[in-house]
């Protein structure tokens, strides 16, 4: 396994692992970079790529994902964050917009998510979870108490 982080003008990281046995070999690798744009109070932008390869006997399954994130403080209390994740194999995108407000003893989070609908997956319905959570468009509110 490799876990490397460099904090310079641009932040860079790599997390990689190889898991090998008699019948299988799993390779996981993630590389990413981040930078704070000198706009307003600073806009943090981040990009990350992850690849997973799983070989079992003569079969191989590969998954690839890319994620982008932008985060911006709005004063001392509020923060706006956008995250977009792309499944490169299935051509799906998952998008999240979060407005958070942090106070001394609690925080409030409003999250809008836009994800593929159940019908967008090439998977039989009986293999999909029974819950609708994570499918389509959703709005979530979280109250977090910090004690």
Regions found by a protein language model. Name each.
Residues 94-118:
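C-terminal structured domain segments
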Residues 1-3, 30-32, 67-69, 96, ...:
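Membrane-embedded beta-strand positions in outer-membrane beta-barrel channels/transporters
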Residues 5-87:
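Detector for outer-membrane/organellar transmembrane beta-barrel domains
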Residues 99-101, 110-112, 133-147:
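Outer-membrane beta-barrel "beta-signal"
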Residues 22, 29, 91-100:
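Generic detector of contiguous secondary-structure segments
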Residues 7-8, 90, 101-105, 147:
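A generic beta-sheet turn/junction motif
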Residues 119-132:
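Solvent-exposed loop segments that connect transmembrane elements
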């Amino acid at each position: 396994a490799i876990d490397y982080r460099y904090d310079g003008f641009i932040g860079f990281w790599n997390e990689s692992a190889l898991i090998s046995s008699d019948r299988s070999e799993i390779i996981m690798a993630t590389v990413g970079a981040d930078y704070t744009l000198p706009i307003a109070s600073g806009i943090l932008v981040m990009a990350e790529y992850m690849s997973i390869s799983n070989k079992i006997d003569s079969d191989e399954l590969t998954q690839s994902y890319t994620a982008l994130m932008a985060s911006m403080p709005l004063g001392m209390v509020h923060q706006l964050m956008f995250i977009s994740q792309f499944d490169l194999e299935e051509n799906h995108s998952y998008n999240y917009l979060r407005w958070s407000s942090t106070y001394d003893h609690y925080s409030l989070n409003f999250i809008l998510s836009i994800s593929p609908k159940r019908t967008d997956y090439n998977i039989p319905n009986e293999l999909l979870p029974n819950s609708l959570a994570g499918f389509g468009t959703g709005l979530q509110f979280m109250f977090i108490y910090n004690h």
